[in-house]
Amino acid sequence: PAKNFIPIPESIDYKNEPVETAVICDAIATPLKVMKKARISHADKVGVIGAGGGLGIHMIKMLNLNNVTSVAIETKSNKKQTCLSEGASLYLSPEKNDFHESIMDFTKNSGLDVVIDFVSSKQTLELSANMLGNGGRLLTLGGSGDKFEVDSSQILLKELEVMGSKYCTKQEVLDSLNLDRFRKLLVQ
């Protein structure tokens, strides 16, 4: 229906840059929604699981643009340089033996404030919950359908929040298209 059409601002040359326009409508608008939904602030330390994928890289860039400290968590070692050059303060592979120690060292034993899990498998969701500090927020965007276990006393004592997020709203796409500063986020 016509109500689903979104006006593209004149400042965006969608005829000559159709790929960039499409990226703004997904890989920029989705991280914008995540920032709002997870209530991410400048003081937060944020882990991004699946940081080397399209949404993950743009999430790192969005966090960096907003002066938020991020930890790129990725199993593919060939993504390390991209994650770091796009603004991640630290790059870690969850397959390393000292992974949990590295998170605790980086956060001075407080744990992460937010973990954004673009993979959302049983393994990554359980890992996410264990990385969070007091008042931590876990936001999952993957749709694996896997069940995962978290110690309920950990949720209680740390006052953790677990939330899901799917694709952004029409308004968030409009917001992304209308903010010229997001053009800087496009991965070259």
Label each PLM-derived region with a short phrase.
Residues 66-68, 122-186:
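Glycine-rich phosphate-binding loop and adjacent beta-alpha segment
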